[in-house]
Amino acid sequence: GLVLLLVLVEFMVLALRFVGDFRTGGVIDITPDLIIPYAEECTNDDRGARVENFTGLFATTRWIDLPRGSYQVCINYVNDGEDGEVSFLDEIMPTAQYDAAKLPAERTRTVFSLWMPYGCETAQLQFTADCGKNQVIYITGAQIVPTHAWAYVRLLTGLAFCAVLDWVILLLTRRVKFPIHTLRGRYIAMALVGIGVFACLPLGLGYLTYGHDLSIHLSRIEGLKAGLLAGQFPVRMDPAIINEKGYPFSLMYSDVFLYPAAVLRILGFSLQTSYKVYVASITAATVGITFYALRKMFRSDCAALLGTALYTLSFYRLTNVFVRAAVGEYTAMAFLPLVVYGLWRIYHQSPADGKKAEPWCWLPFALGFTGLLQSHLLTTELAVFFTAAFCLLYFKKTFTRPVLPALCKAAGAAIVWNLWFMVPLLQYMVQGVCRISGKYDAAYLYDSSVYLGQMFLMFGQSSGVAESIQSGIAGEMPQTLGLALAAGAFFFLLAVLDPAVRKSSRDAARIGSLTLGFGLLAAWCASDLCPWYALFRCEPLQALSKTLGKLQFAWRFFTPATMLLVVCACCAVVLYRKFRPEAAKAMAAALLALTIIPAGYLMYDKCTTSEAVTYMSLAAVDGLPGQVGGGEYLPTEDTTTDDSVWGRLTPEADDGVELTEFTKNGLTIQLAAQNTGDTEASIRLPLFYYPGYHMTAADGAALTHKNGYLTVTLAPGWQGSVQVRWTGMWFWRAADCISLLGIAATVVLYRKSQKNAAHV
C-alpha cells in the first residue's frame, strides 16, 4: 500500500510539473527598432542594424525578459562578408546553454537552440561581423520561439529518477530480491561499475571537451535525427547537414548504434547530452562485454576483472574517446573482446573427446563481427586480417569438421544480418559514387608510424594531433599502448620461462603465446620498424600498398594490439595464480597501478587543458570541415573542397527556362517550369547527386546529374511540374527484408534450441 501511494504521489508531482513546464509564452519578435548599434561604425534604420568594413561586435538587442525553458532562436540577416556570429548574453547569472551560431554569407537565416535553466530579465543577443572592404552585414530581425523540449526532458529525467528511487526502496524493504544473490557477485558488480564510472569522469563536466572528430560525429547524430523525422528507416541519406543537400553518412558509415542518441535528440535532449549518454553507454558495453568474454575464456572472475580494467582504461581506448573523439573506433573496440572469445570458442571444440560439436559456438563470433561492421569498417578490416592469419596458422584445425562449419556459419550469419547495410555500401563503392580520397597508400602508413620508444610510454598529453614521424613527437597526441601492456607481456614471458608455472594451465599458456605473438605483430605494424615505405616502392605490390593504405594511419594497429596484449596479461596472472598466488596478486596490483594512474592523469589533463565546447544543436557545427571532415562521401563529380560546396541553395536554370514554382522539404523537391527554347535545357537542383533519387514520370523531363548535382533536363517546349525525392533502390529494401528475416530466424532457432536443451 505504501509503495502504491508513493508511486501515486510521484505521478502527481511529475504530472503537475510537466503541465507547468509545458506552458510556454508567445513568440518574442525582435524587430529592427529593438536592435541597437554597439560599435560606432554600425548604423540602424527600419531595415535593421548595418555595418560595413568592420570586424568585431557591432550590434546587440535591447534587454529581453526570458522565463526558464527551451527556445529556438531564429536570426534573419544579409551578409556578403566572412562568416558573422551570434551569441547570447545572460547578464546576471550566466547559466544559459546555447550554440555560438555562425552567420554564413550564403544564407539569410540561422537557427540555434537556447536552454534557460533559470529565467532572466536582462538577456540579449550579440552580433559579431567579419567584413572587409565593400562588404556589409545586415541584421534584419530575430524571433525567439519557445519549445516544449524543456518539458519533455524534465519529465523523462524525472521518470528515470523515480524509477531508480522506487527500485532502491523495494530492495531496502525486501519486496524484491537483489538480482545478484552472492556477496562475491555484488563485489564484482561494484568493481565493474567503478571501472565504468572512472572511465567516464570527463563526462561529468557541464560541457564537452574538444575532440578531433567530435563535430563530425555530432553531425552524424543530427543527420540521423533529421532522417528519422523525415520518415526514413533505416536512414541512409542525411537530410540536415551541408545545407540540406543530402549526404550519405548513414549509408557509407553505419550508425545503427547512434540511433538511441538520435531518439534522445528527437525527445528534446541537447546534442551534447545525447552524446554523453552514448559515450557512457558504449563504455558500459565495453565493460560488460570484456568481462563476459574473459570470464568465459579463463573461468576466473579475478582475471576477467583485471582484463576489463586494463582494456577499458587502456591508453589507446581513452585517447580514442576523449582526445580523438573517434566514435567509430572506440565503439568497435567494445566488440573486439567478443571476436576474440568467439574465435577461441570455435577452436576450443574438442571432437577427439567424442563430444558433439557445439551447435551455437559460432554465435559470439558472428555477433562480434556484426558489432565491428556496424561500428567501424577499418577496424573490421583489421579484425579480418588477424583472423585470417590465425586461421592460416592453425590450418590443420581450421579445415576439420567442427571448426570449418562453425566458421562458415558465423560468416554466413554475419553477412545475412548485415546485408541491409552492405548492399547499398557495395553499390556506391563499386560504382565509385563517392569521392573517398585515394591519397592514402603504404607510404602514408610509414609517415604515420610510431617510434618504438614512444609506443610504451607511461604518460601522454591530451592535446595535439598525430604528426608526421619526421616531425618528432613533441606536442603530439598520445600514441602509446601504455606501460601496463608492456609489463603484462613481460610477466607472461616470465611465466612461460618457469616450467612449473607454464604447466599449471596449458590453455592459458597457449592463449597467451598466441595473443602475445599477434599482439607484437600488430605493434610492429604500427611502428617505424615495419617496412611500409619499401612496400610503397615495390611496383608489383602497388595494389596491396593501396589496399593497406586505406587504413590511413599505421597507429590504427593499436586497436588489435591493445586487445591482444590485454588477454596476454590476463594469461600471465592466470598462470601464476594457480601455482604462485602471491606473485599473481603482486602482478595484478602492478598492472592496475600502471593502468589507473596514467588513465587518471590523461583524463585530468583533458579536463583542465582542453577547450570547453557547447553543442546544443547542429547550429554549433556550422562549417564544412566541422560537419563532414574531408568530405570523403561527397559526389565524385564534385571536385570542390572549399566553401563553394555550401552555396547553390536555390535551383539554377539554363537560359530559356522559366521556373514558376519551387518548394524544397528536406530531400523532396516540387517544381514547375517551362522550357521556352528550342533546345534541351536543364535546372540544377540544390541536391547532391547520389543513386536513390527518383522523379515522378513526366514525358519530356528526365532526372540527370552534372558536376555532382541533380539536374532536371527538359525537352524543347516542355511545360509542367515534377517531384524529385529520395526513395532509395528497390533492391535495398529486398536486402532489408532478408536481414530482418535472418535475424528473426536466428532468434527463433536459438530460443528453440535453448528450450530443447533445458528439457534434456
Which ranges hold each PLM region?
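Active-site-proximal, structured, solvent-exposed surfaces of multi-pass membrane proteins
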Residues: 149-151, 178-180, 643-760
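Perimembrane helix-loop-helix junctions
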Residues: 382-415, 491-505
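Start-transfer (signal-anchor) and selected internal transmembrane alpha helices
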Residues: 1-18, 150-202, 509-510, 590, ...
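Active-site lumenal/periplasmic loops and adjacent helix-entry segments of GT-C-fold
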Residues: 196-335, 342, 371, 377-378
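Membrane-interface alpha helices of multi-pass inner-membrane proteins
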Residues: 342, 361-376, 410-416
